[in-house]
């Protein structure tokens, strides 16, 4: 299964996967507005490639059911909270 991947110029780390290049007909208008003008990144064969941040099966299922897959960036790490938790565990 081939898919085209686009990145959002408005939301860093947000990517849109669609089955056909430049065919955004299945993407809701509200999502298109929030996403901004898509920037083409690459064409990928999902049968032959692993993806770094998302599960290939979830991408394929979403594209079959909805006609697209939206990848959101991972939540930011709160390094201060992690440091506080480590310190609390070290205190006797």
Curated annotation (Swiss-Prot):
Positions of region (Disordered): 69-92
Bilayer-crossing regions: none
Residues covered by the YcgL domain: 1-84
Pfam families named among the record's database cross-references: YcgL
HAMAP family: UPF0745 (MF_01866)
Protein name: YcgL domain-containing protein VC_1957
Organism: Vibrio cholerae serotype O1 (strain ATCC 39315 / El Tor Inaba N16961)
